Amino acid sequence: MIGLTRPQLDLTDFPAVRQKFREQRPQLVLHCAALSRSPACQESPACARKLNIEVTDCLAELAAAIPFLLFSSDLVFDGRKGDYDENAPPNPLSVYAETKIAAEQIVRANPKHTVLRLSLNGGASPAGDRGFNEEMRLAWQAGRTFKLFTDEFRCPMPAVVTARAVWELAALNQPGLYHLAGSERLSRWQIGQLIASRWPQLHPRIEPVSLREYPGAPRPADTSLNCAKVRRLLSFPLPGLSEWLNANPHEPF
């Protein structure tokens, strides 16, 4: 497996990407690179389109004859309904969501390729700044209060579980569109409470707020995902976050 970081390869340098592809000749591509911070996408839509759409187009073209898995997002939905399955029509509320839908369309045009829509993922990243759990700890270390929505609902999942599921799906080689998320629908505030149960020092630094108080671009209220389709393929059940935390007290999170 070859995992390329940004210093190793600028994905917007398409000649360099093509050269690297020719050198490595991969048999499978997992495309999880993106500009994924929604506020950053709102501020720099051209950059978001470059990274999220044009890069995907380049990689999907290079991988036309091999399995290709794009990591997409539950945020492609408007959040009015919740419990979205793969047949539910997307309705983006943000630049980020618009770019992910466009990337999905590129990938799904090839019947060999797969789109995985994920929810929040947490865990231990190399730099300690990627997962929602790490964002909370960084805010605490900086002395900031971390505001968590009581009326925004997601289906969070530990990244280690997502990784296991992705490898199983890649091995099965059944292309298509799949939702892959935890089995527990939780508000951001509930998620924060669960994380603070492991890191008690966070409690004074988390504050419940409503989406109505958010000044930025509209946020979908309930993007919980129905994952029945992918569960039928996997060899293990997708856990809820509270279940996983209780069962894995020593796993980093």
Label for each model-derived stretch:
Residues 148-153, 178-186, 233:
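Glycine-rich Rossmann NAD(P)(H)-binding loop
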Residues 11-51:
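NAD(P)H-binding glycine-rich loop region in Rossmannoid oxidoreductase-like domains
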Residues 99:
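Active-site helix of classical SDR
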